[in-house]
Amino acid sequence: MIILGIDLGKARTGVAICDKGELLASPLTVVTEYHREQLVEKLSALAKENKAELLAVGLPRNMDGSEGESAQNAREIGALLEEAAGLPVEFVDERGTTITAHGYLNETNTRGKKRKAVVDAVAATVILEDCLRRRRNQRQG
């Protein structure tokens, strides 16, 4: 199943994609959009263009596991995406994903403007990898 991983941000939203066999997650793009409706349109178009069957949306929980304003916003955008794209949305706890993304970028010595341009897509890839890991574990039961 092709799944898009989505790391929502105030201005930049990272998007990642996996192969049909759900083995490999890769950064796809970063969508720069400040307006919710246009963001949902752009993400829906990406889902259709890439033949996605599921959207894995990062859920920014607080470190104690509670949900604040950002998590509520993610849930609202997820509901809009589900309706606009006609695809199921699965929320993935994204605590620590940006830190992990920065770690990957440090390992590859990615710096400056290039780093800023890709960090959100790499964070989306981490979210998608978490989703894929959870799906594999559920199948193995």
Predicted feature descriptions by range:
Residues 1-4, 10-141:
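Phosphate- and other anionic-substrate recognition elements at nucleic-acid/protein interfaces
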